[in-house]
Amino acid sequence: FPPWM
């Protein structure tokens, strides 16, 4: 889970 998601 990317930080920008």
UniProtKB/Swiss-Prot annotation:
It comes from Pithecopus azureus. The modification Methionine amide is found at residue 5. It comes from the Eukaryota. One of its GO terms (cellular component) is extracellular region. This is Tryptophyllin-T2-4. Belongs to the frog skin active peptide (FSAP) family. Tryptophillin subfamily. Keywords: Amidation, Amphibian defense peptide, Secreted. The keyword Secreted applies. GO terms for biological process: defense response. Expressed by the skin glands. It is found in: Secreted. Its main location: secreted.
